[in-house]
């Protein structure tokens, strides 16, 4: 089991917008991710999640798990490389323990962040597999 400490910070929306903060953190030079809470039942969400300077990038190439690891603590995960994507992703998540720095954090802070490309749906929905070739399923 690999334990990672996640860090978070609450900021007042009076001084920064999520987009301005995201741009200042990434400076258009490093990859980053901005997730915004959705409007539900007429109420705006409370959280914006910004992730940047990733320790690891997980990709799906030809329906197989591909890892780009930038942190030596995660080196043992490299053995998952080449596994069928969903099996590899499950194994990866079982080997990680994400610990938050404050129990008052937003519920989503102890998580892995990212996205799945449209074609990756075929890996989750077998009925779509005939319509979308595995070689197109990348995330």
Outline where the language-model segments fall.
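Signature of the chorismate-utilizing enzyme
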Residues: 1-139
């Amino acid at each position: 089991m690999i334990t990672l400490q996640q860090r978070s910070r609450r900021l007042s929306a009076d001084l920064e917008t999520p987009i301005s903060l995201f741009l200042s953190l990434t400076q258009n030079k490093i990859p980053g991710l901005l997730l915004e809470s959705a409007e539900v039942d007429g109420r705006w969400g409370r959280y914006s999640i910004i992730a940047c300077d990733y320790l690891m990038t997980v990709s799906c190439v030809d329906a197989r798990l591909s890892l780009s690891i930038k942190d030596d603590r995660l080196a043992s995960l490299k053995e998952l490389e080449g596994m069928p994507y969903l099996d590899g992703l499950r194994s990866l998540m079982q080997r990680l323990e994400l610990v938050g720095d404050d129990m008052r954090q937003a519920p989503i802070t102890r998580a892995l962040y990212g996205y799945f490309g449209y074609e990756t749906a075929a890996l989750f929905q077998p009925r779509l597999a005939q319509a979308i070739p595995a070689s197109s399923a990348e995330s």
